[in-house]
């Protein structure tokens, strides 16, 4: 066992000196016994980040460094951080180094995997396209998810990213029935607890592994927890040949933690203070999320947008890796339309007649055209009022307002707050509903009948109730 000594501790950065010729490799895990964490041996894992010269290595800690002193021994494990993987992890909550944090005892996993791995080669990747049904109208119609693809949920603070993601977990895990891996990266611990309890109640937890590195963790843990979750997902894909769902909330915190670590390591900051290696760090993570000839990983990632600015380097770099982007908009949330998806800003690579069929594609495009016309007319309406519009424009506005309201939907995961039961709407029902609105079949119904309903039949029922009143 190669043993060094701590020579310096600055927050989560630890310098360790080793004997001549005994330096551990970059990314190796080094263990230290920190009495502040608990009574166990080797309870603090640090990762080698730099070789400084004079046999010194600089490491980033995965847990608190309070209680460490100079001169303490540090053991080189000779390998990167390895975590337990496989069926034994299902139904459990792990931290960045694979230790359980749910109080249900140790994980007796037969297999372990390093968190740093190469992305699959060109030849191993699978490029066939299949649509994944989510049961959320606005997403299934306008931003269809590809199975084995990567989707991003973009939005500022409080636009509803986490709620949309929790609904996805509920709907896809319930109806798709595959294995899910959830990475909680630098988000609120309360939300992580909510998700766990919800999964326990619904029974989905039996098919899910939760990997948490929440806001309270040091930057080293937040920068690595998504890699731990990815290793768990890769095992199910590569070894067990499964189709895996990977949920990451929030990928921005991965970037944010990377920028903290980068500053601590003394690297020059780049644009807006981010790390100079922003594109590389994100690329190494995203390229591992892919479908191979053995199985697939379908990823849904929340992306926090600082100050609602989509040109910020973190969200802008993330855009390049995704097959589709669901943009959550504050003005739409202000109208009370949830999910607050912007139907004109959101895009999907597979919104294509070859993949979706001619009818779905035409309806989706017609919905976008109608909403765009309404958006263009809003200035005229604000200045001159509705009466100055032509009859054709009045009809467009009338239908657009119905479409806008019909894009809202009650969620299962929000039922406890709204008092309205959630609705799962199949893709054919979604397409039919919007097609009939566009054809003018419901021009005589009041627009409020279309707000917060599931299928179109429910809107018709609601309209009847309004008429009876």
Swiss-Prot record:
GO terms for molecular function: ATP binding; ATP hydrolysis activity; proton-transporting ATP synthase activity, rotational mechanism. It catalyses: ATP + H2O + 4 H(+)(in) = ADP + phosphate + 5 H(+)(out). It is a peripheral membrane protein. It is found in: Cell inner membrane. Keywords: ATP synthesis, ATP-binding, Cell inner membrane, Cell membrane, CF(1), Hydrogen ion transport, Ion transport, Membrane, Nucleotide-binding, Translocase, Transport. It is an enzyme of class 7 (translocase). PROSITE patterns: ATPASE_ALPHA_BETA (PS00152). ATP binds at residues 155-162. GO terms for cellular component: plasma membrane; proton-transporting ATP synthase complex. Its main location: membrane. Pfam families: ATP-synt_ab, ATP-synt_ab_N, ATP-synt_VA_C. Its EC number is 7.1.2.2. It comes from the Bacteria. F-type ATPases have 2 components, CF(1) - the catalytic core - and CF(0) - the membrane proton channel. CF(1) has five subunits: alpha(3), beta(3), gamma(1), delta(1), epsilon(1). CF(0) has three main subunits: a(1), b(2) and c(9-12). The alpha and beta chains form an alternating ring which encloses part of the gamma chain. CF(1) is attached to CF(0) by a central stalk formed by the gamma and epsilon chains, while a peripheral stalk is formed by the delta and b chains. PANTHER family: ATP SYNTHASE, ATP SYNTHASE SUBUNIT BETA, MITOCHONDRIAL. Produces ATP from ADP in the presence of a proton gradient across the membrane. The catalytic sites are hosted primarily by the beta subunits. Belongs to the ATPase alpha/beta chains family. This is ATP synthase subunit beta. It comes from Syntrophus aciditrophicus (strain SB).
């Amino acid at each position: 066992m190669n043993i060094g000594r701590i020579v310096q501790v600055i927050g989560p950065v630890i310098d360790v000196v080793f004997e001549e010729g005994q330096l551990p490799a970059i990314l190796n895990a080094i263990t230290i016994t920190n009495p502040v964490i608990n009574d166990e041996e080797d309870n603090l894992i640090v990762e080698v980040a730099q070789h400084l010269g004079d046999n010194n290595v600089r490491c980033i800690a995965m847990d608190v460094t309070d209680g460490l002193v100079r001169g303490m021994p540090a053991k080189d494990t000779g390998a990167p951080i390895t975590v337990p993987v496989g069926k034994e992890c299902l139904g459990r909550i792990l931290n960045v180094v694979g230790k359980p944090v749910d109080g249900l005892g140790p994980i007796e996993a037969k297999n372990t995997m390093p968190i740093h791995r190469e992305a699959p080669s060109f030849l191993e990747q699978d490029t066939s396209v299949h649509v994944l049904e989510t049961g959320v109208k606005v997403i299934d119609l306008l931003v269809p998810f590809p199975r084995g693809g990567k989707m991003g949920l973009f939005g500022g603070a409080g636009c509803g990213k986490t709620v949309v993601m929790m609904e996805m977990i509920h709907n896809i895990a319930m109806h798709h029935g595959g294995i899910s891996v959830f990475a909680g990266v630098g988000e609120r611990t309360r939300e992580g607890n909510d998700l766990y309890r919800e999964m326990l109640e619904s029974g989905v937890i039996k098919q899910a592994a939760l990997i948490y590195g929440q806001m309270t963790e040091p930057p080293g843990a937040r920068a690595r927890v998504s890699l731990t979750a990815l290793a768990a997902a890769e095992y199910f894909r590569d070894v067990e040949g499964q189709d895996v769902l990977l949920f990451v909330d929030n990928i921005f915190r991965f970037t944010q933690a990377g920028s903290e670590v980068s500053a601590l390591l003394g690297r020059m900051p780049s644009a807006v203070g981010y790390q100079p290696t922003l594109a590389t760090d994100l690329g190494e993570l995203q390229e591992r999320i892919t479908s191979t000839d053995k199985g697939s990983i379908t990823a849904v990632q929340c992306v926090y947008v600082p100050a609602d600015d989509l040109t910020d380097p973190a969200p802008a770099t993330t855009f390049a890796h995704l097959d589709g982007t669901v943009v959550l908009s504050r003005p739409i949330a202000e109208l009370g339309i949830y999910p607050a998806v912007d139907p004109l800003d959101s895009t999907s690579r597979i919104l294509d007649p070859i993949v979706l069929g001619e009818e779905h594609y035409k309806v989706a495009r017609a919905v976008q055209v109608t909403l765009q016309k309404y958006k263009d007319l809003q200035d005229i309406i604000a200045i001159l009022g509705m009466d100055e519009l032509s009859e054709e424009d009045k009809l467009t506005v009338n239908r657009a307002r119905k479409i806008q309201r019909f894009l809202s939907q009650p969620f299962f995961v929000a039922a406890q707050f709204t008092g309205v039961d959630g609705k799962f709407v199949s893709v054919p029902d979604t397409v039919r509903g919007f097609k009939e609105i566009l054809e003018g079949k419901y021009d005589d119904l009041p627009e409020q009948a279309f707000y917060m309903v599931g299928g179109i039949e429910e809107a018709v029922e609601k309209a009847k109730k309004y008429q009876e009143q």
